[in-house]
């Protein structure tokens, strides 16, 4: 009977110890000579045999037949568990069962040497597994029932290994070490060669954008604070300078990768996973470009063997050490980041490229755009046609020559774009890549060429990592906004020139109202322009240059640049709809006023006076709304940008004393 027992405990039930799929291994009831206490001891041992049989079935099921499932990925989602982490778990589980098998062999040798040994001896000898097997079975059952997959297996095993039972902890740590072997192989391929070896989508890095977990904020966020149409949600947005979606900014040009945070083990922080993601992206980008440009050298400075040895050393450790792991990741990341920094800043002249971005997208070359506005003013007043884009680019080239900007290498990289009605092929391509434009709706044609005007720039490798299409699109939004402010300022200055030409002529009350309105409009627009160029652009750009010059780490540069662009969009109020809408309304009123003045050089007739009255009331209303928004936000003690603009507009308290209204006087 002892041999029957040992065979049953080895997974081979017989007539004395029977197997039932539901209840497992049990002592047969047909033996009256067994004392109840003996039956109890034998059934206790049978529980070990039951667990062992189920362990071996699990191992055979997921290591023997998993290869057949590889060719049917569609069935994997329905058919249950699969993947290399599961196979590694089975391998580790098998190694944990080895001491149990050895114990059965040792017992057999002891019984052969001493046939008088009792069942109690077997019970005593195998007692060490009575704690271990049920605890490991909990892990196996959880993996099966919850269909735990990939790196989630690491998390499950790790959580159960944190208990206080030394044999259980030791066994699960052994299984975890085997599973980590798979992770280290994937890490080596990704970080050293830029290869994502993940057939079953088990790794915590995936190809494609991140799924995004934006939680919907219901109507409770929309409470009206009575601040000129400013809602609670918008007020809270004022406090957040990072309102811009950063997702596409971090993407390389060829393929986009992202973290699969939901399966990242909890003992690997997200900050470490992001470093791993960055290294792999950079290596892949560089390897792909090496093929195209046959560049010499490696982004890892030919230290692949050293780093591979360090990762192998980590793999050999019986226990995972986050400190050692992060140190190795940091060393690889530092090497990659420093190489990219050198490539960007020293070889590709990043500072020069940023200067170009500032000169053109941020209107740093003011004399160029002043000349362009004068040259292109008439051709962009009307809705654009198929030839407008060509004409505008000719005008841009002529303006560049006028201001002695004759850089043959730079100008071909810049191209002014016009989105006109009927330009479907380009609009479709743009919308597929970036979504609809902020300025014009795809359903309606732009009212004028100015509304459809944009700027494109051909970014050279490897700066495309920093200046992605999404980043350039955001620069384009700022460009359109700054150009519209500059154009209004130029038109108001032209009106002032007309006023000076007629100052010797007799003027009436309507003329006084007209020129005072121009004065108030120019005051507001000039201060807005000064705020944008000095308080926002120059200030943020100098901070960006300082951060670039104070580091040798590419990732720091990218974060600084992302922060710079976010601040531009936030501090210029493009992201703050109440202020942005109000400013656009004011700019439109200024356009209308300049058109009225240009068309009526002499005294205004009755119709012109009526139009002027409408403009005065509109400007008064919008300037009052702007003042309310700026003052209300200042009173809430948030957003220093709005307070800075208010300081520019109300430095001598004239705005306050006028009741927060400009351009309001008797007709």
Curated annotation (Swiss-Prot):
In Gene Ontology terms, what is one molecular function of this protein?
A: gamma-tubulin binding
Any coiled-coil regions, as ranges? none
Carries keyword Cytoplasm? Answer: yes
Question: Residues annotated as region Disordered?
Answer: 425-445
Matches recorded under Pfam families = GCP_C_terminal, GCP_N_terminal
Localization, per the record, is: Cytoplasm, Cytoskeleton, Microtubule organizing center, Centrosome
| UniProt entry tagged with the keyword Ligase | no
Q: Which UniProt keywords apply?
A: Cytoplasm, Cytoskeleton, Intellectual disability, Microtubule, Primary microcephaly
> Per the record, GO CC terms?
centrosome; cytosol; gamma-tubulin complex; gamma-tubulin ring complex; membrane; microtubule; microtubule cytoskeleton; recycling endosome
> Biological process (GO) annotations?
cytoplasmic microtubule organization; meiotic cell cycle; microtubule nucleation; mitotic cell cycle; protein-containing complex assembly; spindle assembly
Describe, from its UniProt entry, the tissues in which this protein is expressed.
Answer: Ubiquitously expressed.
Which disease is given in the protein's UniProt record?
A: Microcephaly and chorioretinopathy, autosomal recessive, 3: A disorder characterized by congenital microcephaly and chorioretinal dysplasia associated with poor vision and nystagmus. Variable ocular anomalies include microphthalmia, retinal folding, retinal detachment, optic nerve hypoplasia, absence of retinal vessels, round areas of chorioretinal atrophy, and attenuated electroretinogram. Most patients have mild developmental delay and mild learning difficulties.
Write out the function statement from the record.
Component of the gamma-tubulin ring complex (gTuRC) which mediates microtubule nucleation. The gTuRC regulates the minus-end nucleation of alpha-beta tubulin heterodimers that grow into microtubule protafilaments, a critical step in centrosome duplication and spindle formation.
Q: Which family does it belong to?
A: Belongs to the TUBGCP family.
> Assembly and partners?
Component of the gamma-tubulin ring complex (gTuRC) consisting of TUBGCP2, TUBGCP3, TUBGCP4, TUBGCP5 and TUBGCP6 and gamma-tubulin TUBG1 or TUBG2. TUBGCP2, TUBGCP3, TUBGCP4, TUBGCP5 and TUBGCP6 assemble in a 5:5:2:1:1 stoichiometry; each is associated with a gamma-tubulin, thereby arranging 14 gamma-tubulins in a helical manner. Gamma-tubulin at the first position is blocked by TUBGCP3 at the last position, allowing 13 protafilaments to grow into a microtubule.
Protein name per its UniProtKB record: Gamma-tubulin complex component 4
| Species lineage | Eukaryota, Metazoa, Chordata, Craniata, Vertebrata
